[in-house]
């Protein structure tokens, strides 16, 4: 079964540990990735159920996640913690994401070729139950005509929204609702916060 939130075994283990902590704060885990390197980087994306998350929220999540990871200690080596919002052209990792963003453009990639292709671009058209499980519906252009295809959710290896004016307007609305001052909005600062807590964790394990 597809798990776009956490792809590897260690990612899934980390998700089991931190998801309850994030949910207790009123947020949801969108994606988690442990990236290798001289010092590993633990990347966490989180959001509010209704959308819209700010820098202070990311800092609160980082503090709580750092605390539980210090207790559970699932990582043997040093790591750096990054907590971020999903961004405007966000990844779609949960079935409900394809319903929430129905009507917006997205790029989808499958594990195996379907009719000779693995990459699809079109407008999200919701979710429906299929014979083989939940299907993500996508309106695509073929030969100058629009047709709706269904891709089994378990076939997906990657999915992401496409940056459009309509999407930007919706994301800015969510950020405004989350308390971000739009006129002073710094997208780079908003979308990602690298916390000192993560750096402290790395130093402690060296």
UniProtKB/Swiss-Prot annotation:
Localisation per UniProt entry: Cytoplasm
Primary subcellular site in the record, as a coarse category = cytoplasm
> Where does this protein have coiled-coil stretches?
none
Pfam families the record matches: DUF150_C (PF17384), RimP_N (PF02576)
Gene3D superfamilies listed in its UniProt record: Ribosome maturation factor RimP, C-terminal domain, RimP-like superfamily, N-terminal
Q: Which SUPFAM superfamilies match?
A: YhbC-like, C-terminal domain, YhbC-like, N-terminal domain
Q: Which NCBIfam families match?
A: PRK00092.2-5
- What job does the chain carry out? Required for maturation of 30S ribosomal subunits.
What family classification does the UniProt entry report for this protein? Belongs to the RimP family.
Q: Which HAMAP family match?
A: RimP
Q: Which PANTHER family match?
A: RIBOSOME MATURATION FACTOR RIMP (PTHR33867:SF1)
What is the name of this protein? Ribosome maturation factor RimP
Q: Which organism is it from?
A: Paracoccus denitrificans (strain Pd 1222)
């Amino acid at each position: 079964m597809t798990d776009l939130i956490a792809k590897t075994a260690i990612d899934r283990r980390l998700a089991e540990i931190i998801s309850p902590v994030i949910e207790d704060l009123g947020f949801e885990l969108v994606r988690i990735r442990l990236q290798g390197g001289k010092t590993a980087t633990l990347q966490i994306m989180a959001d509010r159920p209704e959308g819209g998350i700010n820098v202070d929220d990311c800092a609160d999540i980082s503090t709580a996640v750092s605390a539980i990871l210090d207790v559970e200690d699932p990582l043997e080596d040093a790591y750096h913690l990054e907590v971020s919002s999903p961004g405007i052209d966000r990844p779609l990792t949960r079935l409900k994401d394809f319903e929430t963003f129905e009507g917006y453009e997205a790029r989808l990639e499958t594990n195996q070729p379907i009719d000779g292709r693995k990459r699809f671009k079109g407008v999200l058209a919701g979710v429906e139950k299929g014979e083989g499980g939940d299907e993500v519906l996508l309106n695509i252009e073929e030969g100058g005509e629009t047709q709706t295809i269904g891709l089994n959710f378990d076939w997906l290896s990657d999915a992401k929204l496409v940056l459009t004016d309509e999407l930007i307007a919706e994301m800015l609305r969510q950020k405004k609702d989350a308390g971000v001052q739009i006129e002073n909005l710094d997208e780079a600062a908003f979308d990602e916060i690298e916390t000192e807590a993560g750096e402290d964790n790395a130093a402690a394990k060296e």
